């Protein structure tokens, strides 16, 4: 029953946003993409979570979420460096939500992308990534879609497909899984 429901949602979305939309085209981009795509988009440098471990109970937490919870949303950790987040957690004595203690490891950046390699010779392999989102495939294939469809700007590209994230705490229902479906539609305008 679940797969039928999911497929119905995908079909309805595709029909509404791709087939019934004027000047909109569908795409099925690659799941494995060259590392240069992710470097150019900034993903290799910044698609990570700031993680801290509680030394007492060994639980792992996102530093930004600890700050948001402690400040009740009045502090924006997105504009803070790791050092500033550590300083806030220390100065405001932010405790572990599991055990209540205040004994943290330093923040470490946890890479959210799955990395693998392509090639048969070990010393000549190229690094590639499983896509953490589908949007980059739409951007990379913009000219291919425009040329093959003779589309004039503005036009849209829609895609339904799997994305993969190296979640540190998978299993938080449907929100923090390592493999999931995305439905994205990008509009390209002047």
Give the positions of each predicted feature:
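TRNA-recognition modules of translation machinery and tRNA-sensing kinases, especially anticodon-binding
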Residues: 1-190
